[in-house]
């Protein structure tokens, strides 16, 4: 457990709306994001937008006690305050290294990220429609916090 970590389970995604005509702002919370069904203290961080539909974003589920990325959550921004988010968790003893990238293959959207399990590094693909995850072992160590970008060539 990371005892130096100050914020434990307090960072949540909020929607800020700014009306440029009236200069009024509002903050909306999603009650479902306050209580994701996981058995650890968590923060949500590093939101990224879907490439197929700007209505959806994906956030990193960060285990605040262990200092590890345990999964990702899909959030509907059009129905923010009432939508139940879709949660994608890594298998036991597997952790993400950083925020995912959204990639499209064969008309399907995936989250692609580096991950690790027992000192081995992987590239993991999560199908956001089915929730299935496939991981491919890579022959080098990828450290936690490694940021990346994937692009088509």
Q: What are these language model-derived features?
A:
Residues 1-153:
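Beta-propeller domains
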